[in-house]
């Protein structure tokens, strides 16, 4: 504008200020007009039959001789045009009145669809300005009345937040070099003004609610001026926002806006948590889909990987469908790779996700972890866990994951080979309180040493408990692992001394000791030097007439003279696997039988005694006598009435192996036989309250007690045990195993000549005491090998087989054993031997138990 030289600087300044005020008002009006038009356009359904604009530019109508002109050439220099443009001639106008010193004008706007705009940049509000608005585009020219046509354009000074708008074309994709691939996961950013920062995310902060697992763009600047496209959540700039353009995914319609808009504060969204007033299903952003979460595990930004792993842990919590889908989408490998991440919070979040994914009966995820070398990766993570609370939390998570993995048979040997030594040396030995010099260091600052580490110890012993039910090679490696048996026995001693006889840690420890005691008399080094010959002469078993009163009394007199326990002398304190069969460990087992109320602890304690008493070896003979001297026989017999059948079966197995000592057999017949008979059903019409396995165990124990014990056989007759056995032998819906066991027990009773006449007076016949023909003639594909079954007419009799059953996992399987399964009819006087593991289908008390599902952890 040309001004006379005579005018004062004050008048020039006043004129400039007036023009600036007018320009500001005009800018506000234009911004309001643009927003209104955009809102109308987004509500219009565009049809391809409408005629396009010929000139490719906008048309503005003129009123009162006040034109507003677009310059198409200038616009095209900054714009990406839509392919087709349509005008909806609805004669609708929106006018705005501007008042200044010179003239009042109205600006009519025609409703336009598919107009062209330039690529936008986010507007940053200047300090002290009145509000957040976008400046008028640079290609608008204003001419007012009384102003010379050569008046220079009033130009807004360049502002970092300067912005103009662009409507994306169909399937719009930015060609900027920093834009990620279209098929990749899209970042999600919260609304502005929330106070988050990059330092908060990189320090490992996880937001408090599940809505806070927003996924940030790793290429987005976190502060300051951005001279480029605005990265915002899909749908942030919609019909009501200041920017109609939004970033599109490959499956979205570029002309449809389904989400409301939340303007950003300045040019960027805050990376902080969600505002408390925001509903989870409101419009700012959507929850990421599972494939997107899995893709985010490989993002370059630490905060994205951290939130993705934590969110995946949340999604997989008690959700079997998500676990299967993660396995199908190959989500396990990126999680395992995150275990090597240099940042501890990311490692913890990834391990927590693996912990949840590996929980449950499904085996696919467990196998995927194994096949991706997840077990050695977890072992390495345990070794590099660090110190302090963070290190302890990571140790708990890693050991919990290993415990979950150990419930699958095909992973157990992998754990033995890759994680056994690490678990022992990193967790069990240093935190159990045991010292290699034999000292006791149970307390630190007034607490038992292992209390703070008890969760990690529980997980570790749970994992070892599961893998100890694997084959003999696993048991051998565990017995010979330096410090393992010593630490476990020390924990057992400490728990019993503190009265913690029902804790989960104690349960795992006792089950572990029971399992590694299985076949201990055969599998320890130099086992042959501990072997003994059978106590009873072989001639006793060949003739039924040998079961006489005089022979029984003779054995009793000979055994009463020797009722002492002579454990082998040792020059050095026992350590390692030698601790498994020492008198101290036997006393601990008996103490648990007397004081514990946990079925799993009772079962494991009785099973450990059963394993140690099996076989003809020096320590087996000494332990049978030690149990008697410690009053353990009566304590075991008291649990025959326990409500848990697993406990009853374990007690029966222990009593049967303890009957290898003739003095024990007499005492058990005197004090426990009535309880055994009471567990049998008293009516053939009434179905037994016990399962088939439990009934067979009870009958087999009765058989072992009355073998060579006339007084016990008489007591069985007086307690109506014969009636119950005959009912079972006659059938009445009983299984073949029950009928066969009852038949051989009755045959043993009829073998006592002293009892035949009283039995005949009671109305019994010889046929009532014979083994069922159907039971003996059929091929036995499934044989109860826990009892030495007696068939005196069978030649080539086999050795007796007494049960020695370690805890195993809950996967159902048949009862397996070594050797031939058919016609296993051994005698009572031969060697006490053992069987392979019995696999049960009970989850509550089995040897292999899953760890409880991990709660969402604050990482």
Curated annotation (Swiss-Prot):
Residues 15-44 form a coiled coil. Residues 243-254 have a biased composition (Basic and acidic residues). It is found in: Cell junction, Adherens junction; Cytoplasm; Nucleus; Cell membrane. One of its GO terms (cellular component) is nucleus. PROSITE patterns: ARM_REPEAT (PS50176). SUPFAM superfamilies: ARM repeat. GO terms for molecular function: cadherin binding. Ubiquitously expressed. Residues 226-254 are annotated as: Disordered. One of its GO terms (biological process) is cranial skeletal system development. It holds the Pfam family Arm. Its main location: other. Interacts with C-cadherin and with zbtb33. This is Catenin delta-1. The lineage of its organism: Eukaryota, Metazoa, Chordata, Craniata, Vertebrata.
